[in-house]
UniProtKB/Swiss-Prot annotation:
The modification Phosphoserine is found at residue 40. This is Tyrosine-protein kinase Yes. The active site is at residue 396. GO terms for molecular function: ATP binding; enzyme binding; non-membrane spanning protein tyrosine kinase activity; phosphotyrosine residue binding; protein tyrosine kinase activity; signaling receptor binding; transmembrane transporter binding. It holds the Pfam family SH2. Residues 1-20 have a biased composition (Basic and acidic residues). It comes from the Eukaryota. Phosphorylated. Phosphorylation by CSK on the C-terminal tail maintains the enzyme in an inactive state. Autophosphorylation at Tyr-426 maintains enzyme activity by blocking CSK-mediated inhibition. Palmitoylation at Cys-3 promotes membrane localization. It comes from Homo sapiens. Residues 158-255 form the SH2 domain. Its EC number is 2.7.10.2.
Amino acid sequence: MGCIKSKENKSPAIKYRPENTPEPVSTSVSHYGAEPTTVSPCPSSSAKGTAVNFSSLSMTPFGGSSGVTPFGGASSSFSVVPSSYPAGLTGGVTIFVALYDYEARTTEDLSFKKGERFQIINNTEGDWWEARSIATGKNGYIPSNYVAPADSIQAEEWYFGKMGRKDAERLLLNPGNQRGIFLVRESETTKGAYSLSIRDWDEIRGDNVKHYKIRKLDNGGYYITTRAQFDTLQKLVKHYTEHADGLCHKLTTVCPTVKPQTQGLAKDAWEIPRESLRLEVKLGQGCFGEVWMGTWNGTTKVAIKTLKPGTMMPEAFLQEAQIMKKLRHDKLVPLYAVVSEEPIYIVTEFMSKGSLLDFLKEGDGKYLKLPQLVDMAAQIADGMAYIERMNYIHRDLRAANILVGENLVCKIADFGLARLIEDNEYTARQGAKFPIKWTAPEAALYGRFTIKSDVWSFGILQTELVTKGRVPYPGMVNREVLEQVERGYRMPCPQGCPESLHELMNLCWKKDPDERPTFEYIQSFLEDYFTATEPQYQPGENL
């Protein structure tokens, strides 16, 4: 179809840090090549980074690679996720403290430094609050997920809020972190309790993470073991920084944090003027448009997807985008803003390592071992489990539509738009631009897209991971794939793939959609793949 793909070099840029807030970041649509500067070796890989082979990339609509990838997704219903501190719910607290530095993006924003204190004037907007800096006396808007009530547990550097066990392990096990590094988070299993997660080391397991449940007393105190009780969490943490006292290791330093993404670019920056965007480096080109690295308002680095006129109706796109921006999860790429008149522009978070497919084939991903690959699959399942809970549908789940950031963080992109495409070679479902090899048979043949057809696609995506980006059904053309799958053919276990993972793939490929597992089950299976026989929480010595 004359679709071409170009890709630039890449380098580290935006890092991930889960927020201190009830629900993580926003949602989106986007895939593209990596940042055009230097190649940075993947810390988790066993070999050094390599140069990108730009000549071996194939066609995609928006610069992923391998085959055609439009964008993907459709919606039915959804639930609105509350922001960090929903309007009117600051509990009477008016003094908040900054958790991170922030550089103003507009004339209405306030720049501030970590530790700066604010009086909150108006928090009815949810994501962006009007505040007055106590230090400077200036008024302006601040991102609500960058602040916490002064002198609260949320303002403590070691408190990471609502974070799962697996995400805690990912952060603590990042390269460069030492034994004893720690964080405190909400308990996943016990309401009102907390968990202390510590990086440890032993001869059998090497680097690992231990989790200790912090329980709450009826009188408001806290303890890990009843023989050592504390009035506050702060006192508990201080005690264990001075003595291991039964833990695997005394607490040394707080786990490093990275600024979270703001919810949107700025207050009221949703439908933005085209002139506010500067397209700087073209990252990819495909059948339906281009992807650029650029800058918004001269201040903020973003990814910009430009759609060819006629790809979809602007009114339908804007309606779908309104739904997509309300979906927020730290494994979904946040949708920042749109230019809603043709040519449509879609503005999203920039992810430094580009698409998962390119990362596996041409980047540091080709050196990854099974534990890292399974963890990436678990992250994707985490994001899809959220989409499942929100009664949303992706429609085009594949490695080319997953973006990779620093430290192997994966985020789902390009959902919510596939059903809006008006190209005949795509809407025919068996046309040249339709991703047959990733699509469940009931969706390809009859247009029955559901979360269960997404589960089928996830099974195909798993083969992309373990084969480092190999095209599914090697040696077979689209029509042959459709015929053979209908007759019961399923891909054999890829070389080097454990049979237990192949069994999960086959569950995803059940002919009856109702027999396929939920993403909640898949996430749990993958997160516990290497640790299923270990206790979730450590009792500690003499505890």
